[in-house]
């Protein structure tokens, strides 16, 4: 009974982490794609490296490393690797909770920073090709104009702005897009946390099962 339970846990944890690893590869690939094709980072000169592409590259790389530890720990029945996998998942989970709390506490300051960064970047529209490309992409995608409206463009709105008198600013449109997709973002976040907790549970259970099997076999 002990050996069959051990084998079952091994393969469950292995395939769990294999899927986890492939997800990490996809996230890493998407991050690299955004780094190559996206210019949104130039809109914020204070934190030019804090872009979605960079974040996805870091997240994808971390997921791949953690999943690799989980795969190797389960197949090799290595308690050290399993506990490393458990600790890393716990650290990631705590970091996510901390980030969520910080975003909630400093939500207003974050909004002000984003609005100020976008307003400053408008002044570089005609002098910086990267900034111009980023603004054109945002305005075309969100069907918006400027930060708060067409009045932000002192020399007249660019061609990427949609035509019409009731055009909204990109800051408002971005907030509306986030609010309209909040349910999907929340469900995705909860699913990620549940997967992490399951991974930690599998790792601890397998670790305990290895101990029990070793005692039965007299190892």
Curated annotation (Swiss-Prot):
Extracellular membrane side: 33-54, 107-181
PROSITE patterns: TM4_1
Pfam families the record matches: Tetraspanin (PF00335)
Topology in the lipid bilayer: Multi-pass membrane protein
Compartments, as annotated in UniProt: Cell membrane; Cell junction; Membrane; Synapse
Residues annotated as glycosylated: 129, 148
Gene3D superfamilies recorded: Tetraspanin
Gene Ontology molecular-function annotations: identical protein binding; protein-membrane adaptor activity
Cytoplasmic side: 1-11, 70-80, 207-219
Known function: Structural component of specialized membrane microdomains known as tetraspanin-enriched microdomains (TERMs), which act as platforms for receptor clustering and signaling. Participates thereby in diverse biological functions such as cell signal transduction, adhesion, migration and protein trafficking. Plays a role in the activation of monocytes and B-cells. Acts as an essential regulator of B-cell development by promoting interleukin-7 receptor/IL7R signaling. Also promotes, in B-cells, the BCR signaling by recruiting PKC to the plasma membrane in order to phosphorylate its substrates.
UniProt name for this protein: Leukocyte surface antigen CD53
Organism the protein comes from: Bos taurus
């Amino acid at each position: 009974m002990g050996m069959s339970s051990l084998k079952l846990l091994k393969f469950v944890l292995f395939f769990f982490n294999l899927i986890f690893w492939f997800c990490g590869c996809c996230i890493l690939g998407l991050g690299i794609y955004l780094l190559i094709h996206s210019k949104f980072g130039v809109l914020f000169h204070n934190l030019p490296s804090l872009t979605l592409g960079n974040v996805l590259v870091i997240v994808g790389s971390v997921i791949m490393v953690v999943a690799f530890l989980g795969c190797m720990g389960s197949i090799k029945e290595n308690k050290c690797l399993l506990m490393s996998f458990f600790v890393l998942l716990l650290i990631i989970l705590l970091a996510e909770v901390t980030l969520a709390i910080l975003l909630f506490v400093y939500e207003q300051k974050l909004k002000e920073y984003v609005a100020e960064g976008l307003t400053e970047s408008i002044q570089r529209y005609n002098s910086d090709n990267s900034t111009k490309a980023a603004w054109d992409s945002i305005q075309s995608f969100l069907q918006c104009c400027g930060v708060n409206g067409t009045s932000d463009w002192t020399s007249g709105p660019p061609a990427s702005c949609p035509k019409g008198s009731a055009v909204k600013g990109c800051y408002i449109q971005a907030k509306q897009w986030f609010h309209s997709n909040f349910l999907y973002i929340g469900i995705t976040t909860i699913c990620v946390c549940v997967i992490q907790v399951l991974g930690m549970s599998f790792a601890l259970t397998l670790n305990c099962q290895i101990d029990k099997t070793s005692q039965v076999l007299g190892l």
